[in-house]
Regions:
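Active-site rim/adjacent substrate-binding subdomains
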Residues: 1-96, 108-118, 123-126
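Catalytic glutamate of the conserved HExxH
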Residues: 100, 104-108
Length: 127
């Protein structure tokens, strides 16, 4: 998929967030990268680049204290090639991008992977 089209999917995923979450995104850049770097793989404890679809790097909002300020923005990286490697068709890519964007934004709001797994498990039970 062309980079421009993939970036548009990321923008659409952000635009599809509920307004209250969009308003609360503070001091965070969301970027598209082709592949994760070795450093990013190490931080995320992944051994293969196709396993890491997105990465949040920063200080979650729940950890920001009174002294938080004058800092570089948090960074959410969405990795295009690993997502494409896991999906066959454009609509699968779009769905996966939305899932990854929501997951990484949840980290920005302070949710850890264990909590996110529990939430996803509860969603599946309700279906």
């Amino acid at each position: 998929m062309e980079r421009r089209k993939f970036e548009a999917l990321v923008v659409r995923a952000i635009d599809n967030l509920p307004a209250e979450f969009q308003r609360k995104l503070e001091n965070v850049d969301i970027v598209v990268e082709e592949w994760p770097t070795r450093g990013q793989l190490g931080r995320a404890k992944h051994i293969h680049p196709t396993q890491l679809l997105g990465l949040y790097q920063g200080v979650p909002q729940t950890k920001r204290g009174r002294g938080y300020g004058l800092v570089l923005p948090d960074k959410i990286s969405i990795f295009q090639k690993p997502i494409e490697a896991q999906c066959r068709f454009g609509d699968e890519i779009e769905a996966k991008v939305g899932e990854v964007v929501r997951h990484e934004i949840a980290h920005h709001f302070g949710l850890d992977d264990e909590t996110l797994r529990k939430i996803e498990s509860e969603k599946r039970k309700r279906k």
